[in-house]
Amino acid sequence: MLHTRTIALLLVGLVVLVNAQTFQYSRGWTNGKRSPLSSSSSSPSSSAAMEPLTANQLLASALSSGGLNSLKPSEKALLRRFLRNPCDLRVASLLAAAHPTKELFPLAGNSFDSAESAGAAFVLPPFLMDPDESNGGIGGSNLANGRSMEDELRFKRGTATGFSDHRQKIA
């Protein structure tokens, strides 16, 4: 009976320690790095300066300033959209096809090979443009290829054009 209580107490203690470490890690408190908000003399500007850089900020800071200044407004909008959602492969392929040079994207490898990168001029497709980013937005409901935006964003190209079934829409 004593061994059972000892084992149970050790297991409970282990669970508490693991939860405490997970909590500290989620708050960024590992290695003695406490949040500056706990002291009453800290200002919001100093706490913003002490925040760690996110992956998006690191990627943006890794781009050379000359590279950012040479981008067109539509290319900057595409880069901002890629930084918001790096898993969108359409945006990533357009971004890589527009600038296949290694010096503009030093973190990316040069192993990207696409049929779209054959030197064509950079044109941001209208369905990727955000109207709030002052790049013109979408002028009409149909795209340059004659399809509507809903058809362009559809997963399956062979389905009907009507949206009678809500499961056909992209969430």
From Swiss-Prot:
GO terms for cellular component: extracellular region. Keywords: Amidation, Cleavage on pair of basic residues, Neuropeptide, Pyrrolidone carboxylic acid, Secreted, Signal. GO terms for molecular function: corazonin receptor binding; neuropeptide hormone activity. InterPro entries: Procorazonin. The modification Asparagine amide is found at N31. The modification Pyrrolidone carboxylic acid is found at Q21. Residues 82-171 form a propeptide. Residues 1-20 form the signal peptide. The keyword Hydrolase does not apply. GO terms for biological process: neuropeptide signaling pathway; positive regulation of heart contraction. The keyword Secreted applies. It comes from the Eukaryota. Transmembrane segments: none annotated. Belongs to the corazonin family. Cardioactive peptide. Corazonin is probably involved in the physiological regulation of the heart beat. This is Pro-corazonin. It comes from Anopheles gambiae (African malaria mosquito). The gene is CRZ.
